[in-house]
Amino acid sequence: MNKALAIVYSTCICAIILCAVLLPGARLSFLLPAAVVCGGILTATYRLACRSFYSTAGEAIIVCVFSLIVCGIILNIWYFTTASGGSFSNPILHNSDSHIDWYYAMEELDGQPHTIFMPNFRYYIYIVMGLCAVFGRDIGVPLMFNALCFGLTIIAVGAITFRLTANRTTSVIAMAATSVMCYLLMEATVLLKDVPLTLCMAVFILGLTQIFIDKKLSFKPIICLMLGIAGVTFLRLNMLLMLFTGAIIFMGRNRNVNATLATVAAVIIVVFVAAKSFMHVPQVAENVLMSDSNPVLNQTRFVRPWDNLLGTPYHEMSIFKRLLWLPASVVVQFLIPFPWNYMRDTIFGPTEAIAHFGYFWYLAGAVFLFWIFRLKKVSNRAMVRLAWWGVFLTVATAFMTSGRVSRYCLPLLPTLLPAVAFTINRKSSRKPLLIWLGVFSVLLCVTLITCYQLQMYPWKFR
């Protein structure tokens, strides 16, 4: 280990210990050893399995980001326990999804009648149950699992980018870009499944691109595809349809590739139908909806200006009207959560504020647009297909949700960030890229100011 890495490791260790001392509430007998083990898994994976694109900078990125997430987890556990009157086994979770997933899983683990109403059954509770059955009933257990998944996601995105570009620097840039996506970073510190889902998406893409580029069937990409499909099945079942479109988009002229991807597509459909048929919601003793029963949530409801502008509830709109609103929905999906609302969601956990500072998210979007208009033609076919798949999924998500749930786009980052990293590392395009970023910054400022006025002073636009 060189001197720079030694400094990084020692600084990160001190930061984690300091947070643990200043913010009591976590079960340190689990959390600190778990941090060491998970950190060791990440560094070992990067050093041993990624030798072709390993770099000291990449390892430093992984260690720093993982340590930052662990500190965020300690902060949130303090908030869920000491600050709110809960405990690590019985935390106070104001986020309805987190509350339902945790307490439903705990009731299932204890074999008790369910007092938590789950509107849409999800297999994710079995992941929470399994982790807590092995490591103890502790909110820190699934959160540390999230931290591990975030680190593995960084490595997977780096591997995808290296597979597409064969350039170590571009791979490190992609890893850095993944690590500064503040929304995804925040998701790793709360009990939500978007980070593991992003990892599953990245693993699936890794297998998909390897088959497309190598044009032959081998053991490693098949394992990646199967792991991705299995993970998505447990985390967000409907997203299997997105994986299905990916298998179709990557079909080409090669018969071996087409046969393999057709088989993968068929497997996805079979798994989707089978998983849907097994879904059920057990009878509950008392239905409890967080949105109705939690007074804190009731007090923090806010008017949605976007819904007001739409006029008609989005789910009642015709397909034609949804298509008319689609460009605006995509823009809203890209812009939210707005920076000035950073205190709005801190009731769910102090780290929620981080999600609102998505300036690197905006930067990545600007660079990706530049890639579409200037560098798409000089990129290889695999990168082009991957990027267009990401665009299709982003637009489809906006169409389904009217752009109101931007976190649904987080698992799509592995489809877009390789093109972003490729653009940043292309020296011949630096000057036009900087000019475009300047123009984009002006347009972004004007748009955000307009959105601020619409949200804060809606009566002015009636």
Where are these regions (language model features)?
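Membrane-interface helix-loop-helix junctions at transmembrane boundaries of multi-pass membrane enzymes
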Residues: 163, 169, 214-221, 345-351, ...
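Hydrophobic, aromatic-rich transmembrane alpha-helices
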Residues: 43-44, 158, 329, 333-380
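Extracytoplasmic catalytic/substrate-binding loops of multi-pass membrane glycan-assembly enzymes
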Residues: 78-102, 113-127, 136-137, 338, ...
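Membrane-interface alpha helices of multi-pass inner-membrane proteins
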Residues: 185-186, 220-239, 243-251
